[in-house]
């Protein structure tokens, strides 16, 4: 298309050294050498000597040149140390087989049994996400790594080789799902049990102890069983002729711990706490068993004087009249005697100190309830006779005597007020209004 001019031959400069190896020859790179004169490139070479002398090996001769490879890091053949043409990996495999054939081993060699190829029912879909599978199926498939099949030349145990592919991939997936479900159920059960234990420990303990012995059931009865036992106890006790006090004393004789009549009464009427009733129920059941089987138990109970464990109530104290008069005289002198004075009064009257002390306490409470005050507690001086009320006229501001000495009071009346009557006109049509206290006279005139 265009006529290109021919350039004259280019002469080399003596300071330039040609590249004999063709390392930097632009003509070797396709598409870069457009003209024939660009087939050889020259580079300036410095002839300056180093300050430290001749550096051996730095001067390059034409015979020592080597090919320059800009991509040496990607040269797999040089890195692996493989020389030759063909596939290098096949050569490696052949060398490995030759080495294994040369090496002799005392262990027997075995090959895995011929197995059918692995078959997977579900094809892998890269577009399907994890959560879409979970939402569609409801369960998460746990992928389980498959065992690596053995090579023909590997050493193995014949028994172990037969156990490699015993289960199919589908079964392994199912086992993974079942294990995940089991762990999920176990964690949910543990969390739910931990939450319900706080609210109903008794029901759970009873439910968990269904397989235990009957003794554990008796230790924690419910309210219905306790109520029925209390009714049976009361019925049998009355039928056999025992009192509640006899039952309490019999428990002391049998088990070394005496209960009062009030405790047995509260148990029969279900007025004790549930915890105390649970503690008392085994003892009462043992007592019923002893009463039904031992006929001499009534004789043992009737001998209450052997070990007086039941404290009897103290009888009411009665004081004679002459002793009461003497105590009244002491009370008039001092309403609150000291401990020494109480002991002296008890010796004089031949009484107990507690009886004298209680009498003085009761007498003081009785005096507080009376209308008139009694002897002063501080000095023992009696009050004067009932005080007479002074009339109000004798005070500093006397009031007028309104109420006379008669039995029925009378209201003093003053003079009648003056009545003013206006002049009477005879020709008036309307009568003159008159006071209420004045008579009307003859109305006919």
Curated annotation (Swiss-Prot):
SUPFAM superfamilies: Homeodomain-like, lambda repressor-like DNA-binding domains. Its main location: nucleus. Initially (stage 9) expressed in all regions of the embryo, becoming localized to the ventroposterior regions by early neurula stages. In adults, expressed at a low level in the brain. This is POU domain, class 5, transcription factor 1.2. It is found in: Nucleus. Transmembrane segments: none annotated. Gene3D superfamilies: Homeodomain-like, lambda repressor-like DNA-binding domains. The gene is pou5f1.2.
């Amino acid at each position: 298309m265009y006529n290109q001019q021919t350039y004259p031959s280019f002469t080399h400069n003596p300071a330039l050294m040609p590249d004999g190896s063709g390392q930097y020859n632009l003509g070797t790179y396709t598409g870069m050498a457009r003209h024939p004169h660009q087939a050889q490139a020259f580079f300036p070479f410095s002839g300056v000597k180093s300050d430290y002398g001749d550096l051996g090996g730095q001067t390059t001769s034409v015979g020592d040149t080597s090919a320059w490879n800009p991509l040496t890091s990607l040269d797999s053949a040089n890195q692996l140390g493989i020389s030759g043409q063909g596939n290098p990996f096949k050569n490696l495999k052949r060398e490995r087989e030759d080495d294994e054939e040369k090496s002799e081993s005392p262990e027997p060699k075995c090959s895995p049994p011929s197995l059918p190829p692995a078959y997977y029912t579900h094809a892998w879909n890269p577009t399907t996400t994890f959560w879409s599978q979970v939402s569609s199926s409801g369960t998460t498939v746990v992928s389980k790594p498959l065992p690596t099949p053995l090579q023909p030349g590997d050493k193995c145990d014949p028994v172990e080789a037969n156990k490699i592919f015993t289960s199919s991939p589908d079964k392994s997936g199912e086992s993974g799902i079942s294990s995940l479900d089991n762990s999920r159920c176990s964690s949910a059960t543990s969390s739910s049990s931990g939450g319900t234990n706080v609210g109903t420990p008794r029901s759970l303990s009873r439910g968990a102890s269904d397989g235990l012995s009957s003794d554990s059931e008796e230790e924690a009865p419910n309210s219905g069983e306790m109520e029925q036992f209390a009714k049976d106890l009361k019925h049998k006790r009355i039928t056999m002729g025992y009192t509640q006090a006899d039952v309490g004393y019999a428990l002391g004789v049998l088990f070394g711990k005496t209960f009062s009549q009030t405790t047995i009464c509260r148990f029969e009427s279900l007025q004790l706490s549930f915890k105390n009733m649970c503690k008392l129920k085994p003892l009462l059941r043992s007592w019923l068993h002893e009463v039904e089987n031992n006929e001499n138990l009534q004789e043992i109970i009737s001998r209450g004087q052997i070990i007086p464990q039941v404290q009897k109530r103290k009888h009411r104290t009665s004081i004679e009249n002459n002793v009461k008069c003497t105590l009244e005289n002491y009370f008039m002198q001092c309403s609150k005697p000291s401990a020494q004075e109480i002991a002296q009064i008890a010796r004089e009257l031949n009484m107990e100190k507690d009886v004298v002390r209680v009498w003085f306490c009761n007498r003081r409470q009785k005096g507080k309830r009376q209308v008139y005050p009694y002897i002063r507690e501080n000095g023992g001086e009696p009050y004067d006779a009932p005080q007479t009320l002074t009339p109000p006229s004798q005070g500093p501001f006397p009031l007028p005597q309104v109420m006379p000495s008669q039995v029925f009071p009378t209201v003093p009346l003053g003079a009648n007020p003056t009545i003013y009557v206006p002049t009477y006109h005879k020709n008036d049509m309307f009568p003159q209004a008159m006071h209420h206290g004045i008579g009307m006279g003859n109305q006919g005139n």
